[in-house]
Amino acid sequence: LFAPNLLLDRNQGKCVEGMVESFDMLLATSSRFRMMNLQGEEFVCLKSIILLNSGVYTFLSSTLKSLEEKDHIHRVLDKITDTLIHLMAKAGLTLQQQHRRLAQLLLILSHIRHMSNKGME
């Protein structure tokens, strides 16, 4: 989905300290996406959630304007979540399958956040 022709060799990461661990985390996450047969639209929704959620609590202070901005961001995040559920329903998943898939996708976000934090170290 991100770069279908990109091939990474785990051994290439050995030249940089900590890179092998990042390769392994990236491989585990991308394998999970493949196993779940993640669709392009779902991937876009997940990327949007990550981008919108990354700064909601850290960059906005407690002024009235920032509280309004936080509320707006939360409404957009709710719409993205609704879109994910709609995509799953459109794919023919039962309600139980939709709930399970949504939970699985949202759980992956914590792994992506962890990888991001590791990359920043």
Curated annotation (Swiss-Prot):
Note the lipidated residues of kind S-palmitoyl cysteine.
Answer: C45
Q: What is its main location?
A: nucleus
Q: Which InterPro entries match?
A: NHR-like_dom_sf, Nucl_hrmn_rcpt_lig-bd, Nuclear_hormone_rcpt_NR3, Nuclear_hrmn_rcpt
Cellular component, GO, one term: nucleus
Q: Does the keyword section mention DNA-binding? A: yes
Q: What are the entry keywords?
A: Activator, Cell membrane, Cytoplasm, DNA-binding, Golgi apparatus, Lipid-binding, Lipoprotein, Membrane, Metal-binding, Nucleus, Palmitate, Receptor, Steroid-binding, Transcription, Transcription regulation, Ubl conjugation, Zinc, Zinc-finger
Q: Which PROSITE patterns does this one have? A: NR_LBD
> Which cellular compartments is it found in?
Nucleus; Cytoplasm; Golgi apparatus; Cell membrane
Recorded GO molecular functions are: sequence-specific DNA binding; steroid binding; zinc ion binding
Q: Which residues form the NR LBD domain?
A: 1-121
Transmembrane residues, as ranges? none
Pfam families according to UniProt:
Hormone_recep
- A GO biological process held by the record: negative regulation of canonical NF-kappaB signal transduction
Post-translational modification here is noted as:
Ubiquitinated; regulated by LATS1 via DCAF1 it leads to ESR1 proteasomal degradation. Deubiquitinated by OTUB1. Ubiquitinated by STUB1/CHIP; in the CA1 hippocampal region following loss of endogenous circulating estradiol (17-beta-estradiol/E2). Ubiquitinated by UBR5, leading to its degradation: UBR5 specifically recognizes and binds ligand-bound ESR1 when it is not associated with coactivators (NCOAs). In presence of NCOAs, the UBR5-degron is not accessible, preventing its ubiquitination and degradation.
Q: What family is it from? A: Belongs to the nuclear hormone receptor family. NR3 subfamily.
User: Subunit structure, briefly?
Assistant: Binds DNA as a homodimer. Can form a heterodimer with ESR2. Interacts with coactivator NCOA5. Interacts with NCOA7; the interaction is ligand-inducible. Interacts with AKAP13, CUEDC2, HEXIM1, KDM5A, MAP1S, PELP1, SMARD1, and UBE1C. Interacts with MUC1; the interaction is stimulated by 7 beta-estradiol (E2) and enhances ERS1-mediated transcription. Interacts with DNTTIP2, and UIMC1. Interacts with KMT2D/MLL2. Interacts with ATAD2; the interaction is enhanced by estradiol. Interacts with KIF18A and LDB1. Interacts with RLIM (via its C-terminus). Interacts with MACROD1.
Q: What is this protein called?
A: Estrogen receptor
Read off the lineage from the record: Eukaryota, Metazoa, Chordata, Craniata, Vertebrata
Name of encoding gene:
ESR1
